[in-house]
Amino acid sequence: MYAVIKTGGKQYKVAAGEKIKVEQIAADVGQEIVIDQVLAVGEGSSIKVGTPLVSGATVTVTVLSHGRHDKVRIFKMRRRKHYQKRQGHRQNFTELQIGAIVG
C-alpha cells in the first residue's frame, strides 16, 4: 500500500517502512505524528484520489532525526562590471519513518 502525502509545500509518494527527508517539522525526535493531508491512496491496481484530499485517510510517521542538507552555493556575476556575489544556504530537514497508512 502506498500514499501520496503533502507536507512542507511538497508532495511525497510513501509506503510503509520507508524513510524520507521532508522540510523541517517542529517535533521532538521519537515523537509520532499523524499526517492527514493525504492526496491519494493506492493498493495494487486500485487507487483512491482525493478532491483534493482523501477523506478519512491518514499516515502515521515517527520522527527519526533533524539535520541540515549539504550547502548550496550561489554565485552571481555581471560580466565586465566587476560585480561578484557569493552566498551559501543550508536547508533544515526532518527525517521520518513511515508507519501505518490508513485509507
Swiss-Prot record:
Keywords: Ribonucleoprotein, Ribosomal protein, RNA-binding, rRNA-binding. GO terms for cellular component: cytoplasm; ribonucleoprotein complex; ribosome. The keyword Transmembrane does not apply. The keyword RNA-binding applies. Transmembrane segments: none annotated. One of its GO terms (molecular function) is structural constituent of ribosome. GO terms for biological process: translation. It comes from the Bacteria. Pfam families: Ribosomal_L21p. Belongs to the bacterial ribosomal protein bL21 family. Part of the 50S ribosomal subunit. Contacts protein L20. This protein binds to 23S rRNA in the presence of protein L20. This is Large ribosomal subunit protein bL21.
